[in-house]
Design a protein with these regions (language model features):
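C-terminal transmembrane helical hairpin of 12-TM major facilitator-type secondary transporters
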Residues: 259-303
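Structural signature of the two symmetry-related core transmembrane helices
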Residues: 63-76, 259-274, 354
Length: 377
């Protein structure tokens, strides 16, 4: 499943490094190609909310295999696209896979490992995410230069095929433990204060993260004034740090999920403020953004573990709700960050990110209040 996550994240973000040649070949603007990211996010939201009610009593192994096959189909559709409309269909398909796969990830982890190992399992799943974040953009750019952007997307097809066979051989049959939930369950979940605070915390956290993260490159280019090789190195450091953080976070989650979920956004808020205060320092940018990657990339592991513990009987529905919340918050955060960055500059943008992250920390404390397994904070 980690291989599937790697291929999935690589598929989702591959257009970022191939915008120019894709726009040229499909005879549209780079901005229109960029909308392929937006449509995948929109379909991820829809799929995440629909997958549990619509999948009914289907064997979850079969469902995962179908989603993996659809990922390969998406790569082929984009690679063979002769017009913009076909490209967007391919991007919509990968959105369905993103929403469906991630909404089931916590429930699947709970079925595959004992309760004490769920944090480790989620960390392993997310390591595929972190690894793809490190290499997807530079690898896509390299492959695009060697075999063209169509060849780069076609490379995802055999990777999806390998993941499909691997999952078919290794995953056990996983029948739903109870009947398929209806859409009413999403409203009933919000009646639980822990769920309401938790989803609000997740939403504000990802908004705060992407208010800043989306505009790291223009910040480095215009404020820190780094050249292209240095910029690429900083982004690579962020990715590597994220992989390390994802690999290590399970050790801290064993001690206290509550502490991790509150300290991470507070740390990121401090980093956002420090970036404003040390804007012209390249060394500071390396260190601070490396720390940002270390904690930010690992944070979802903590939230997925919180979900598994808070909604053990409704993990699929809760997972769908969380994926929808995350996708919407990323879109809102990126949009808000763009408005602030263009209208008020990087200082206001980064301070807004810090404020949202502090609020997210408080909401995380509220979401984890009353758990006897957690130390009081």
């Amino acid at each position: 499943m980690t291989l599937c996550v790697f291929a999935l994240i690589a598929s989702e973000f591959l257009p970022v490094s191939l915008l120019t040649p894709m726009a040229r070949d499909l005879r549209v603007s780079e901005g229109l190609i960029g909308y392929g990211m937006a449509i995948s996010g929109a379909f991820a939201v829809v799929a995440s909310l629909c997958i549990a009610p619509f999948s009914g009593s289907m064997n979850r192994k079969v469902l995962l295999l179908a989603l993996t096959a659809l990922m390969g189909v998406s790569g082929a559709v984009v690679a063979l696209a002769q017009n913009y409309e076909t490209y967007m269909i391919g991007r919509a398909l990968i959105g369905v896979v993103v929403g469906g796969f991630w909404s089931m990830s916590a429930a699947v982890a709970m079925r595959l490992v004992p309760p004490e190992d769920v944090a480790k399992a989620m960390a392993i799943f997310n390591s595929g995410n972190a690894l793809a974040t490190v290499i997807a953009a530079p690898l896509g750019s390299y492959l695009g230069g060697v075999i063209g952007w169509r060849g780069a997307f076609f490379c995802l097809v055999p990777v999806a095929a390998v993941a499909l066979v691997w999952q078919w051989v290794t995953l056990p049959a996983m029948q739903p433990e109870k009947g398929a939930p209806s859409f009413r369950i999403f409203f009933s979940l919000f009646k639980r204060s822990a769920v309401s605070f938790g989803m609000l915390a997740v939403g504000v956290f990802f908004m705060g993260q992407f208010v800043l993260f989306t505009y790291v490159r223009p910040y480095l280019e215009t404020v820190t004034q780094v050249d292209l090789p240095t910029l690429s190195t900083i982004l690579l450091v962020m990715g590597i740090a994220g992989f390390i953080g994802t690999s290590l976070i399970g050790l801290f989650l064993k001690s206290s999920v509550r502490l991790v979920l509150s300290v991470i956004p507070l740390s990121m808020a401090s980093i956002a403020i420090a970036l404003v205060l040390t804007g012209s320092s390249v060394v500071a940018a390396f260190l601070l953004l490396g720390l940002w990657g270390l904690v930010a990339t690992a944070a979802p592991v903590g939230w997925w573990l919180w979900l598994a513990r808070t909604l053990p009987a409704d993990a699929e529905a809760g997972g769908g709700l969380m994926v929808a919340t995350i996708q919407l918050s990323i879109a809102l955060g990126s949009t808000l960050g763009g408005l602030l960055f263009d209208g008020s500059g990087y200082r206001v943008t980064f301070f807004t990110s810090a404020a949202l992250l502090v609020i997210a920390a408080g909401l995380a404390l509220a979401a984890t209040r009353g758990n006897p397994a957690e130390p009081a904070l």
